Amino acid sequence: MFQKLLFPALLLLLAPALYAQTVTLRGTVVDTETNRPLIDVAVVVSGTGQVAATDQNGNFVLERLQPGQYALVLSSSGYFPLETPVNADKNEGPPVIFSLRRDPAVESITTPIPMLTLDEAESESEGGGEIANLLHASRDVFQTVAVFGWSTYRFRERGYDSEQFPLYLNGVAINDPETGTAFFGEFGGLNDVLRLRESTIGLEPSDFAFSEIGGATRIDTRASSQRKQIRASYALANRSYDHRLMLTASTGLMPGGWAVTLSGSHRWAQKGYIEGTFFQGTSYFLSVDKKIGLKHQFNLTLLGAPSKQGRAADTYQEMYDLAGTHYYNPNWGYQNGDKRNAVVRYSHQPIGILRYDWNPSRTTTLTATAYVQAGERGDSRLEYQGSNPSPDFNRNLPSAFEDPTQAASQADLLRNNESLRQLDWTSFYEINRNTPETVNDANGQAGNTITGNRAQFIVENQRGDSKESGFNAVLSEALSDRAKIQIGANYQWYQGENFKTVDDLLGADYWLDADKFAQRDIPGVVNVQDNDVRIPNHVVRKDEVFGYNYDENIRNGGLWTQVQANLPSLSVFIGGEVKVNNFWRTGRMQNGRFPANSLGDSEKLSFNTYGTKGGLTYKLNGRNYLYANGFYGTRAPQFRDAFLSPRVRNEVVPDLQPHQVQSVEGGYLLRSPRLRGRLTGYLTQFKNETEASLFYLYSLGVFGTSILRGVDRRHAGIEAALEAKPSAAWTISAAGNLGDYHYTSRPLLYVTQDNTSEPIVNGARVYQENYLVPRTPQTTALLGIKYEGRRFWFASLTATFADDLWYDFDRTRRTAAYVESLVKDSEPWHRALDQQKAPAAFSLDFFGGKSWKINNYFLYLNVGVNNLLNNQDIIISGRDSYRSNYANAAEDLRFYTNELTYGYGTNYFISLTFRK
């Protein structure tokens, strides 16, 4: 019913808009240096009380002016104010172009998005949703005062995953086709050249994409859009990296129509905030523009950011208590006196983008982009033949001992001997060097005998390499002075290469590529243990592929269109899109457990989806606005959710279908010289989603896949923000988010394992209705104050609060089969079913800066200190533990533990920048 009523109503509103003419004053505000449109510039008609603000294209409209001459005052943070006379005639003329000049002395104060505070460790965590919000942030009052303050708690705007916030780099959608997540490490460290961005909020229209329900962000990397400058900076921090050097040079648009920008950086830390972590990252960037006449412009952008990072892991509260710190990390240990981390992430996925802008007339623009990207991403981890060597393995914890005396003794050992809380690299080498074994007919060759020390422990590298190319084109046409239409087309070709290699044999001679549990689970089958039956008795050495090897083939295409119109007191838009999503798996190994269903191409899946969107904004006056927007559509499942055990077989999740998305939002906007505010209510429903996740079944010693079918959830809430400037020097900010994100269905659960076709759970009903959506605080608040001094310095203090961060929960415990043996309302019954949540959290943050002008040079100092009170009890992630090894787990209270991650205590970032 919603979509049936929406389109006729909006079409009736659009009809008179196409050719309506009124006495108004229209204009566009641009940057003098780059000629880029400026967003949210305050435009005041002196003596009348009328106020307007520029939109995302730099345009503003002042209506119902009496004919005559007026004085316009234009002001924007970081620019010199402009006062200029204008004539308001009876008939509208073409838009008047106004140019604002940057105030270089206050640059450090006015940088709209302080990317320098972005933490690389957070950028890849939990899907990166909270960082997606950071890059998505715009001049919108809610985002500018709230998103940065709440990023400490991994806040996700409206509870959405990052796939709902698509990110466009020079016209290219860079969200990962496999998962929908944007991996921001692909361009980390390039802050200086990624400042020029345009964002849409929620369901509002975008000129560059149809966007998703969270909005969209476009970053402009064209050299001609960059400020002409030479810029060098050094930063000192105690977060994921300690040091950062950056250098940027940009020519601006030169005679002959050329422009060039070069940028590079290096970030490093031998020890990150958490023990055992480290970071090494180098970034590079080249952008070249060629402008041909007034109508044609070409751009070539090349960038990359190779990085290597030793990572931390979540663990049990029991281990945090034994270690005496909330920053205990089980991933590392000493080797020959040096710290060594077993879990290291490496990534380098450079991208090349070719962009063409064509302006054949005043009313028509075309932007076309083609791109290619290729690279590798790898995560190392320990692989082993025997028992789990992790120091926080739950069988080794005091709580695993039934005898209280033994439990107390184990607790004393772990508490007082740090080496027992670390990986024992020395023992790995000793064991590997003393395990001689002979492999007959090695690698499938009769008579090929290999003798040597067979590895019991190795470091493996789980690779996720990829190749990608595509194009995106957007045509914009002004239908009249008050209406415009956009038409877009895009296509994406993607091949993901998933396999693992031997990274380090740890002193052994070889690793035997065989499933150690296959003969146990599938007895009597020839070659069942071989991961590739074409190479039985496969002996592998360093850098050789083993275990699994498959490709993800994805082909996506789409068309969209949108019409926007601006009446004197009403703005309306309507749009729609259609998409085709195709994908399939290609196995590169013939697995011994699935010899007929692992090698070659799987079934080719194809999904046709659509989306419709519309909305209106009613202008009460120049300062007060009401708006309402709606969306209805379908979305294809992601590749990650489509296969039962993608590492080893081609089997597809049965009855896989697109899911539905319905979303509405409405609210109030306040824009005045001293007050900016937004109050928004939103309601979004996701229906019939499929969710899949890979995990390790500790009780069986194998990897498995958990699949949920028929997942429904509802995200509802209120966003509010207010920014007040009682004087030119003072700014007071307040914001709040009150959300209610919960599941509304009882989906079916399938749990498979990688070494047998028999499911562990086959279509069990999961009673998760009314459980809360995890991984984000649903209640947040912020209060901030900022002072800007006359001698170009500023300081701000922000208090933030977060609550209702619910832990992710084990679906198998929410099935009838699991709880049937438990007494209702008993402690085990509640421990099995009740969803846990983190305690409420509070933080106090400081940010300040100072700038100096020395002849024609500028020096900027910025200081950011988060968590001034050193609150080390902020839980930012929690989940039910899957490490069940107790005989009677359902009744045994020791089984019901959570694995947690704590946010940083006091942490800082200090940067010094020189600019010419």
Language-model segments: which ranges?
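Short acidic/polar hinge/loop motifs at secondary-structure boundaries
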Residues: 134, 143, 172-203, 220-222, ...
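Short strand-turn segments of transmembrane beta-barrel domains in outer membranes
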Residues: 203-206, 215-252, 264-276
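Acidic/polar loop-and-plug regions of large Gram-negative outer-membrane beta-barrel proteins
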Residues: 289, 297-355, 378-460, 524-542, ...
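Surface-exposed extracellular loop regions of Gram-negative outer-membrane beta-barrel proteins
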Residues: 314-319, 528-539, 582-593, 604, ...
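Outer-membrane beta-barrel signature, preferentially recognizing the C-terminal barrel domain
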Residues: 328-351, 355, 552, 602-611, ...
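Signature of Gram-negative outer-membrane beta-barrel scaffolds
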Residues: 458, 484-621, 646, 748, ...
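Gram-negative outer-membrane beta-barrel transporters
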Residues: 683-685, 706-812, 911-915
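C-terminal beta-signal and adjacent terminal beta-strands/loops
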Residues: 732, 801-820, 850-916
